[in-house]
C-alpha cells in the first residue's frame, strides 16, 4: 500500500475533493474502519468475529470515470472544476485517473477548441457545452465519451471533428450527446443522442461480462469492485440458496456473480438502461433462469409479499439506503440471509435498526474511494 500521493492541485488549493490525500493510506483506512465499527457496534453478533480486514486497491490511477465541467471560452476551453477561489482549473492531470485517460482528457480540451463549442456560462445562462463525461473499460482500455449540451446547436460541430478524434483514439467506442436544457445544477438530461453505432461499453469483472450504457450506474473503482463482487459470491455460496433476489441490481454485478444455471435469480432496478445491460450479460453467460425487471425495488417487494419468497436477498441501494418499508418487507420474507452492500454506513446502520430477526455475522470494508470519507461496506445478515 503506497503511503502518500503528491497532488499539485491539492497543494495549490485548487481542488479539495480528496480531502485526506495528505494522510498515509494506512491512516485513512484506520479512520474509516473505526467509523464503521462504531456505527455497527449495536448490531454485531457478539458470538463470532464480524469485522474482516479491509480490502484496498491502488491509491492513484484507479478511477474509471471522469465528470468534467466545461469552463473557459470556445477558444480556450478548460475541463475540470471551479476552484475555491473561483478560477477555472483543468483537472486533466488528476492522479485518480490512469495515464491514458489523462492524455485523452487533454486531447478533449483541444477537441472542444477545434470544434469551437462555447462552454456554458452559469452566470450568464449562455453557451452550449456543460460537461464532458468519460468512462473507461478496464478490460480493453476502451472509452465511452458523452457531451452534455444545452441544445442541439453544437452537435454538427462535434460530428465534424469526431472522425479525426476517433482516428487518433480508436479505443473510443461509444460517443453520445446528452441534452440538458435546464438552467440548474443537473448533470444530465433525459434525451441521449448516439453519434456512434455502438451504444454500450463492455467490461468484465472476474469471469462476469458486464455492460455500461450512458445512464447506467457503474462502480468507479474496478480494481476494488472486482474484489467486492468476488467476496459477495463467496459469502452467498456458503448458503447454497435455491433462489435469489438482487434488489437495486444496477447492471447485475452482484446477482450475476452469485447466480448459477440451476438457481432462479430475480434482479430489480428502476433504471431501464441498466436492466437492458444486465439481460445482455445473463444471455452471454447462458443463464436461462434469470429475470431482470425495470421496477422500483420497494414496490416490487411489497407486491411479492404473498408470492414465492427467495432463500437469499441481495440489496445494493443508493446512499439513502433501502428505507423502513423495505426493511419490514425483508423481515417478513424471512430469507436464510440478507447480503447488504452499502455506500453509506450511516444509512446502513439506520436500516439495520429496522430489520428484525437477523444477526449481523460478517462485515467488511471495501475502500473504493481513497482519500475521501466514503467507502463501501458488505454486510451479511443471517436469520436467527
UniProtKB/Swiss-Prot annotation:
Would I find Methyltransferase among this entry's keywords? yes
The UniProt record gives the binding positions of [4Fe-4S] cluster as 7, 15, 18, 94
Q: Which domain of life is it from?
A: Bacteria
Active site (record annotation): 343
Q: Which SUPFAM superfamilies match?
A: S-adenosyl-L-methionine-dependent methyltransferases
Reactions listed under catalytic activity: uridine(747) in 23S rRNA + S-adenosyl-L-methionine = 5-methyluridine(747) in 23S rRNA + S-adenosyl-L-homocysteine + H(+)
Q: Which GO terms describe its molecular function?
A: 4 iron, 4 sulfur cluster binding; iron ion binding; rRNA (uridine-C5-)-methyltransferase activity
User: What residues does S-adenosyl-L-methionine bind to?
Assistant: 219, 248, 269, 316
Name the coiled-coil region(s).
none
Q: Which GO terms describe its biological process?
A: rRNA base methylation
Establish whether keyword Amino-acid biosynthesis is in the entry. Answer: no
Please name the InterPro entries in this protein's record: 23SrRNA_MeTrfase_RlmC, MeTrfase_TrmA_AS, MeTrfase_TrmA_CS, SAM-dependent_MTases_sf, U5_MeTrfase_fam
Which PROSITE patterns does this chain map to?
A: SAM_MT_RNA_M5U, TRMA_1, TRMA_2
Its Enzyme Commission number(s) read 2.1.1.189
Identify the Pfam families for this entry. tRNA_U5-meth_tr
Q: Keywords, A to Z?
A: 4Fe-4S, Iron, Iron-sulfur, Metal-binding, Methyltransferase, rRNA processing, S-adenosyl-L-methionine, Transferase
If you read the UniProt record, what top EC class would you report for this enzyme, in one word? Answer: transferase
What this chain does, per the entry, is described as: Catalyzes the formation of 5-methyl-uridine at position 747 (m5U747) in 23S rRNA.
Database matches in NCBIfam families: meth_trns_rumB
Family note: Belongs to the class I-like SAM-binding methyltransferase superfamily. RNA M5U methyltransferase family. RlmC subfamily.
> What protein is this chain from?
23S rRNA (uracil(747)-C(5))-methyltransferase RlmC
**Organism of this sequence:** Shewanella sp. (strain ANA-3)
Q: Which gene holds the coding sequence for this protein? A: rlmC
Amino acid at each position: 500500500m503506497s503511503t502518500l500521493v503528491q497532488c499539485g492541485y491539492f497543494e495549490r488549493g485548487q481542488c479539495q475533493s480528496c480531502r485526506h490525500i495528505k494522510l498515509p493510506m494506512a491512516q485513512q483506512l484506520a479512520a474509516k474502519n473505526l467509523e464503521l465499527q462504531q456505527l455497527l457496534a449495536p448490531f454485531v453478533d457478539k458470538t463470532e468475529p464480524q469485522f474482516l480486514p479491509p480490502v484496498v486497491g491502488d491509491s492513484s490511477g484507479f478511477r474509471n470515470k471522469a465528470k468534467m465541467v466545461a469552463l473557459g471560452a470556445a477558444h480556450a476551453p478548460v475541463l475540470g472544476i471551479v476552484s475555491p477561489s473561483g478560477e477555472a482549473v483543468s483537472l486533466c492531470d488528476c492522479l485518480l485517473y490512469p495515464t491514458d485517460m489523462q492524455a485523452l482528457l487533454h486531447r478533449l480540451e483541444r477537441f472542444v477548441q477545434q470544434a469551437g463549442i462555447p462552454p456554458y456560462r452559469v452566470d450568464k445562462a449562455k453557451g452550449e457545452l456543460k460537461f464532458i463525461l468519460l468512462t473507461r473499460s478496464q478490460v480493453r482500455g476502451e472509452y465511452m465519451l458523452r457531451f452534455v449540451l444545452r441544445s442541439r446547436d453544437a452537435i454538427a460541430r462535434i460530428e465534424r471533428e469526431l472522425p479525426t478524434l476517433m482516428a487518433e483514439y480508436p479505443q473510443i467506442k461509444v460517443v453520445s450527446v446528452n441534452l440538458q436544457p435546464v438552467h440548474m445544477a443537473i448533470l444530465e438530461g433525459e434525451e441521449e443522442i448516439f453519434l456512434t453505432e455502438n451504444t454500450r461499453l463492455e467490461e468484465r469483472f472476474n469471469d462476469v461480462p458486464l455492460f455500461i450504457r450512458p445512464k447506467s450506474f457503474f462502480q468507479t473503482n474496478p480494481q476494488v469492485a472486482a474484489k467486492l463482487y468476488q467476496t459477495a459470491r463467496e459469502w452467498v455460496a456458503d448458503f447454497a440458496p435455491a433462489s435469489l433476489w438482487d434488489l437495486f441490481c444496477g447492471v447485475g454485478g452482484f446477482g450475476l456473480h452469485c447466480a448459477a444455471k440451476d438457481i432462479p435469480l430475480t434482479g430489480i432496478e428502476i433504471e431501464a438502461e441498466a436492466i437492458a445491460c444486465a439481460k445482455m450479460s445473463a444471455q452471454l453467460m447462458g443463464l436461462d433462469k434469470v429475470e431482470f425487471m425495470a421496477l422500483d425495488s420497494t414496490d416490487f417487494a411489497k407486491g411479492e409479499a404473498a408470492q414465492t419468497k427467495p432463500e437469499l436477498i441481495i440489496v445494493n441501494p443508493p446512499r439513502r439506503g433501502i428505507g423502513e418499508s423495505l426493511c419490514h418487507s425483508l423481515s417478513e420474507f424471512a430469507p436464510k440471509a440478507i447480503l447488504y452492500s452499502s455506500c453509506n454506513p450511516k444509512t446502513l446502520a439506520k436500516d439495520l435498526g429496522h430489520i428484525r430477526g437477523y444477526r449481523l455475522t460478517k462485515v467488511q470494508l471495501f475502500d473504493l474511494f481513497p482519500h475521501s470519507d466514503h467507502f463501501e461496506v458488505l454486510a451479511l445478515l443471517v436469520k436467527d
